[in-house]
């Protein structure tokens, strides 16, 4: 199994280039491949970081709506209080971004919050179909305006460059019903969509993915979760492409001899797919099976699986809800809530031999009033 330890070369337009001279490999014995690998049993303990967000009266976090890693720190959207925070990687609050309310320059109900690396801004999509751009260094508002068709709510968005975006929606606040045809578009600045893709009635179903699409090599890869297909849109020409990448009967990225449970997931039409992401050489797929998070890495050169790993967080009967986060394929992180951690610690106190990850959990100081804990793996 190839484990990447922050090997990406940071160059404009080449964020996913991999420097294999700096890559780290972990040898896996053949007998270990007979079953799924447990990530916390093979990772180097030094490559795992656990951050506890320091809390005070100004930043008591509630339910995490979104968590994004940026060069400046960890961006947190609190869906309970509608607040947006920027923490450093030591868990210290740097600043709040914008403010919630009905006044000038305030956002009312954020639908999505994301970081735009092309202009170093935090961008908020509001229920009022407005977009607001805040400077990540100062938190000051840099832009406010209507960027989308007013009758459509953009529920998820990704920047393609400083003012070109891909967006997805399936709800019309004007008609107050879900549309028969979901809408996916590429748009620029204050203009309405340059290019739209409509799905016929048979495939127009709610997308269960956390991220229904991602950007790679200046193209938008759209993943539709019932009939697994990927749509490509070239961000330069805005000419849509369509090609079938995953097949329900015989997934093209799955080795026919690989007993991976991802075949089961495809047979179930991917009801709980979480993430699809891509680098120059690999495709990462994260999904749920039997309430356990799993991810599979596929080699793009021969379309064969490099193995399936299991997030070993469901410790026996404990039901932990975790949120996996991919950022450019370079790491995987999770958010764990205090009540879950306390149950884990209670269980771990009865376990004699702890895995490296379990040992780190066991040493955490946590109470019912603690902020959530962010876990970062620097191994992908």
Regions found by a protein language model. Give the residues of each.
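C-terminal motif of bacterial Sec signal peptides marking the signal peptidase cleavage site
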Residues: 5-6
């Amino acid at each position: 199994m190839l484990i990447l330890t922050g090997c990406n070369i940071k160059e404009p337009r080449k964020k996913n280039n991999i420097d294999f001279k700096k890559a780290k490999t972990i040898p896996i014995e053949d007998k270990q491949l007979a079953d799924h690998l447990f990530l916390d049993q093979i990772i180097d303990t030094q490559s795992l970081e656990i951050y506890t967000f320091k809390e005070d009266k100004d930043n008591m976090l509630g339910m995490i709506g979104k968590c994004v890693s940026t060069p400046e720190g960890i961006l947190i959207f609190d869906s309970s209080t509608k607040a947006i925070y920027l923490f450093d990687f030591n868990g210290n609050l740097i600043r709040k971004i914008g403010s919630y309310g009905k006044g000038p320059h305030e956002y009312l109900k954020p639908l999505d919050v994301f970081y735009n690396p092309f202009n170093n801004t935090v961008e908020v999509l509001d229920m009022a179909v407005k977009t607001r751009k805040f400077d990540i260094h100062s938190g000051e508002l840099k832009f406010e305006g209507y960027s989308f068709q007013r009758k459509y709510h953009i529920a998820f968005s990704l920047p393609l460059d400083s003012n070109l975006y891909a967006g997805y929606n399936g709800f019309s606040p004007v008609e107050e019903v879900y549309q028969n045809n979901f809408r996916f578009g590429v748009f620029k600045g204050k203009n309405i969509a340059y290019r739209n893709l409509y799905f016929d009635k048979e495939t127009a179903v709610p997308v269960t993915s956390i991220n229904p699409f991602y950007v790679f090599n200046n193209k938008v890869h759209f993943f539709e979760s019932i009939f697994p297909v990927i749509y490509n849109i070239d961000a330069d020409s805005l000419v849509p492409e369509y090609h079938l990448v995953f097949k329900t009967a015989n997934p093209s990225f799955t080795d026919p001899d690989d007993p991976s449970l991802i075949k089961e997931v495809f047979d179930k039409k991917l009801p709980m797919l979480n993430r699809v992401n891509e680098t120059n050489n690999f495709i990462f797929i994260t999904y749920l099976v039997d309430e356990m998070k799993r991810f599979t890495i596929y080699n793009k050169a021969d379309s064969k699986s490099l193995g399936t790993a299991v997030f070993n967080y469901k410790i026996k009967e404990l039901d932990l809800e975790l949120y996996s986060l991919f950022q450019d394929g370079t790491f995987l992180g999770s958010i764990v809530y205090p009540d879950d951690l306390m149950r884990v610690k209670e269980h771990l106190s009865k376990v004699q031999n702890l895995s490296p990850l379990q040992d780190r959990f066991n040493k955490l100081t946590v109470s019912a009033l603690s902020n959530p804990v962010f876990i970062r793996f620097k191994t992908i």
